[in-house]
Protein backbone atom coordinates (compact mmCIF):
# COMPACT_ATOMS: atom_id res chain seq x y z
CA UNK A 1 0.00 0.00 0.00
CA UNK A 2 1.25 3.47 -0.88
CA UNK A 3 2.32 5.78 1.93
CA UNK A 4 -0.13 8.44 0.78
CA UNK A 5 -3.05 5.98 0.72
CA UNK A 6 -2.23 4.87 4.26
CA UNK A 7 -2.02 8.51 5.39
CA UNK A 8 -5.41 9.13 3.75
CA UNK A 9 -7.05 6.19 5.52
CA UNK A 10 -5.45 6.77 8.93
CA UNK A 11 -5.29 10.57 9.20
CA UNK A 12 -6.98 12.51 6.39
CA UNK A 13 -10.32 10.65 6.20
CA UNK A 14 -11.12 10.84 9.96
CA UNK A 15 -10.08 14.52 10.04
CA UNK A 16 -12.25 15.36 7.00
CA UNK A 17 -15.20 13.41 8.45
CA UNK A 18 -15.02 15.60 11.55
CA UNK A 19 -14.34 18.83 9.63
CA UNK A 20 -17.16 18.35 7.10
CA UNK A 21 -19.61 17.01 9.71
CA UNK A 22 -20.25 13.72 7.92
CA UNK A 23 -21.98 10.81 9.65
CA UNK A 24 -20.15 7.91 8.02
CA UNK A 25 -16.50 7.42 7.01
CA UNK A 26 -17.71 6.22 3.57
CA UNK A 27 -19.15 9.70 2.89
CA UNK A 28 -15.71 11.29 3.10
CA UNK A 29 -14.57 12.46 -0.35
CA UNK A 30 -11.68 10.60 -1.94
CA UNK A 31 -9.67 10.82 -5.13
CA UNK A 32 -10.91 8.27 -7.67
CA UNK A 33 -8.58 8.91 -10.61
CA UNK A 34 -6.01 11.27 -12.08
CA UNK A 35 -6.01 11.87 -15.83
CA UNK A 36 -3.03 13.29 -17.71
CA UNK A 37 -3.66 14.69 -21.19
CA UNK A 38 -1.07 16.01 -23.62
CA UNK A 39 -2.12 17.65 -26.87
CA UNK A 40 0.52 17.24 -29.57
CA UNK A 41 -0.60 19.60 -32.31
CA UNK A 42 2.67 19.35 -34.22
CA UNK A 43 2.13 15.58 -34.63
CA UNK A 44 0.18 16.26 -37.85
CA UNK A 45 3.35 17.58 -39.52
CA UNK A 46 6.03 15.67 -37.59
CA UNK A 47 5.49 12.01 -36.66
CA UNK A 48 8.51 12.03 -34.31
CA UNK A 49 6.77 14.58 -32.08
CA UNK A 50 4.19 11.97 -31.03
CA UNK A 51 6.93 9.46 -30.14
CA UNK A 52 8.60 12.03 -27.86
CA UNK A 53 5.29 12.85 -26.19
CA UNK A 54 4.51 9.15 -25.65
CA UNK A 55 7.92 8.46 -24.09
CA UNK A 56 7.61 11.50 -21.79
CA UNK A 57 4.09 10.50 -20.72
CA UNK A 58 5.21 6.90 -20.09
CA UNK A 59 8.09 8.09 -17.90
CA UNK A 60 5.87 10.46 -15.92
CA UNK A 61 2.93 8.12 -15.35
CA UNK A 62 4.57 4.69 -15.30
CA UNK A 63 2.08 3.26 -17.78
CA UNK A 64 1.55 3.28 -21.53
CA UNK A 65 -0.50 6.25 -22.79
CA UNK A 66 -3.49 5.98 -25.09
CA UNK A 67 -3.05 7.85 -28.37
CA UNK A 68 -6.00 10.16 -29.06
CA UNK A 69 -7.03 10.69 -32.67
CA UNK A 70 -8.79 13.61 -34.36
CA UNK A 71 -12.56 13.09 -34.45
CA UNK A 72 -13.03 15.20 -37.55
CA UNK A 73 -10.95 16.96 -40.17
CA UNK A 74 -10.16 20.64 -39.61
CA UNK A 75 -8.53 22.39 -42.56
CA UNK A 76 -7.45 25.39 -40.46
CA UNK A 77 -5.33 23.14 -38.22
CA UNK A 78 -4.19 20.94 -41.14
CA UNK A 79 -5.45 17.73 -39.52
CA UNK A 80 -7.54 14.90 -40.89
CA UNK A 81 -9.99 12.60 -39.18
CA UNK A 82 -8.23 9.69 -37.49
CA UNK A 83 -4.80 11.32 -37.29
CA UNK A 84 -3.03 11.13 -33.89
CA UNK A 85 -3.15 14.52 -32.15
CA UNK A 86 -2.44 13.73 -28.51
CA UNK A 87 -2.16 11.15 -25.76
CA UNK A 88 -3.72 10.55 -22.37
CA UNK A 89 -3.26 8.36 -19.31
CA UNK A 90 -5.77 7.52 -16.57
CA UNK A 91 -4.22 6.47 -13.27
CA UNK A 92 -6.07 4.80 -10.43
CA UNK A 93 -5.20 3.13 -7.11
CA UNK A 94 -1.47 2.53 -6.45
CA UNK A 95 -0.06 4.46 -9.43
CA UNK A 96 -2.43 7.35 -8.74
CA UNK A 97 -1.21 7.78 -5.16
CA UNK A 98 2.44 7.47 -6.23
CA UNK A 99 1.91 10.13 -8.93
CA UNK A 100 0.06 12.40 -6.49
CA UNK A 101 2.95 12.18 -4.03
CA UNK A 102 5.49 13.08 -6.75
CA UNK A 103 3.25 15.89 -8.04
CA UNK A 104 2.83 17.58 -4.66
CA UNK A 105 6.31 17.03 -3.22
CA UNK A 106 8.56 17.33 -6.31
CA UNK A 107 6.88 18.60 -9.49
CA UNK A 108 4.79 21.54 -8.22
CA UNK A 109 7.69 23.09 -6.22
CA UNK A 110 9.85 22.96 -9.40
CA UNK A 111 7.40 25.09 -11.45
CA UNK A 112 8.95 28.44 -12.34
CA UNK A 113 7.27 31.57 -10.87
CA UNK A 114 4.83 29.42 -8.89
CA UNK A 115 2.52 31.29 -6.52
CA UNK A 116 -0.05 28.61 -5.73
CA UNK A 117 -2.72 26.73 -7.65
CA UNK A 118 -5.76 28.68 -8.80
CA UNK A 119 -8.74 27.93 -6.50
CA UNK A 120 -11.10 28.65 -9.43
CA UNK A 121 -9.88 25.50 -11.21
CA UNK A 122 -12.65 23.40 -9.64
CA UNK A 123 -15.49 22.44 -11.98
CA UNK A 124 -18.45 22.80 -9.60
CA UNK A 125 -18.75 19.05 -9.00
CA UNK A 126 -15.64 18.50 -6.90
CA UNK A 127 -13.07 17.86 -9.64
CA UNK A 128 -9.84 19.84 -10.02
CA UNK A 129 -7.97 20.61 -13.24
CA UNK A 130 -4.60 22.23 -13.70
CA UNK A 131 -2.19 22.76 -16.54
CA UNK A 132 1.58 22.51 -16.69
CA UNK A 133 3.54 24.49 -19.27
CA UNK A 134 6.50 22.12 -19.39
CA UNK A 135 7.00 18.44 -18.65
CA UNK A 136 10.53 18.90 -17.26
CA UNK A 137 9.22 19.67 -13.75
CA UNK A 138 8.95 15.90 -13.24
CA UNK A 139 12.20 14.25 -12.07
CA UNK A 140 11.71 11.29 -14.44
CA UNK A 141 12.26 13.52 -17.48
CA UNK A 142 15.91 14.00 -18.45
CA UNK A 143 16.29 17.61 -19.59
CA UNK A 144 19.06 16.73 -22.07
CA UNK A 145 16.94 14.14 -23.89
CA UNK A 146 13.84 16.35 -24.30
CA UNK A 147 13.24 17.28 -27.94
CA UNK A 148 10.60 19.93 -27.20
CA UNK A 149 8.96 21.43 -24.11
CA UNK A 150 5.36 20.27 -23.96
CA UNK A 151 2.62 21.13 -21.54
CA UNK A 152 -0.04 18.85 -20.15
CA UNK A 153 -3.40 18.94 -18.42
CA UNK A 154 -3.86 17.17 -15.09
CA UNK A 155 -7.40 16.41 -13.92
CA UNK A 156 -8.03 15.06 -10.42
CA UNK A 157 -11.45 13.41 -10.16
CA UNK A 158 -12.90 13.08 -6.66
CA UNK A 159 -16.09 11.74 -5.08
CA UNK A 160 -16.70 15.16 -3.49
CA UNK A 161 -20.13 16.62 -4.22
CA UNK A 162 -19.10 20.27 -3.89
CA UNK A 163 -16.01 22.32 -4.62
CA UNK A 164 -15.58 23.11 -0.91
CA UNK A 165 -15.37 19.40 -0.04
CA UNK A 166 -12.83 18.85 -2.84
CA UNK A 167 -10.84 21.90 -1.71
CA UNK A 168 -10.69 20.51 1.85
CA UNK A 169 -9.58 17.11 0.47
CA UNK A 170 -6.79 18.55 -1.69
CA UNK A 171 -5.61 20.84 1.13
CA UNK A 172 -5.38 17.75 3.34
CA UNK A 173 -3.09 16.22 0.68
CA UNK A 174 -0.90 19.40 0.98
CA UNK A 175 -1.92 20.92 -2.36
CA UNK A 176 -0.67 24.54 -2.46
CA UNK A 177 -3.98 26.26 -3.30
CA UNK A 178 -4.10 30.06 -3.27
CA UNK A 179 -6.35 31.79 -0.76
Swiss-Prot record:
Keywords: Ribonucleoprotein, Ribosomal protein, RNA-binding, rRNA-binding, tRNA-binding. GO terms for biological process: translation. Pfam families: Ribosomal_L5, Ribosomal_L5_C. InterPro entries: Ribosomal_uL5 (IPR002132), Ribosomal_uL5_bac-type (IPR020930), Ribosomal_uL5_C (IPR031309), Ribosomal_uL5_CS (IPR020929), Ribosomal_uL5_dom_sf (IPR022803), Ribosomal_uL5_N (IPR031310). GO terms for molecular function: rRNA binding; structural constituent of ribosome; tRNA binding. GO terms for cellular component: ribonucleoprotein complex; ribosome. NCBIfam families: PRK00010.1. Belongs to the universal ribosomal protein uL5 family. Part of the 50S ribosomal subunit; part of the 5S rRNA/L5/L18/L25 subcomplex. Contacts the 5S rRNA and the P site tRNA. Forms a bridge to the 30S subunit in the 70S ribosome. PANTHER family: 60S RIBOSOMAL PROTEIN L11-RELATED. This is one of the proteins that bind and probably mediate the attachment of the 5S RNA into the large ribosomal subunit, where it forms part of the central protuberance. In the 70S ribosome it contacts protein S13 of the 30S subunit (bridge B1b), connecting the 2 subunits; this bridge is implicated in subunit movement. Contacts the P site tRNA; the 5S rRNA and some of its associated proteins might help stabilize positioning of ribosome-bound tRNAs. This is Large ribosomal subunit protein uL5. The gene is rplE.
Amino acid sequence: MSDLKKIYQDEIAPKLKEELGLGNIMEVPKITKITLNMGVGEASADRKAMEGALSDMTAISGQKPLVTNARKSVAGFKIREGWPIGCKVTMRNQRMYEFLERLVSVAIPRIRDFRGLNPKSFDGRGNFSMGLREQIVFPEIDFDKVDKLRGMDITITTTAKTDDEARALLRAFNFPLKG
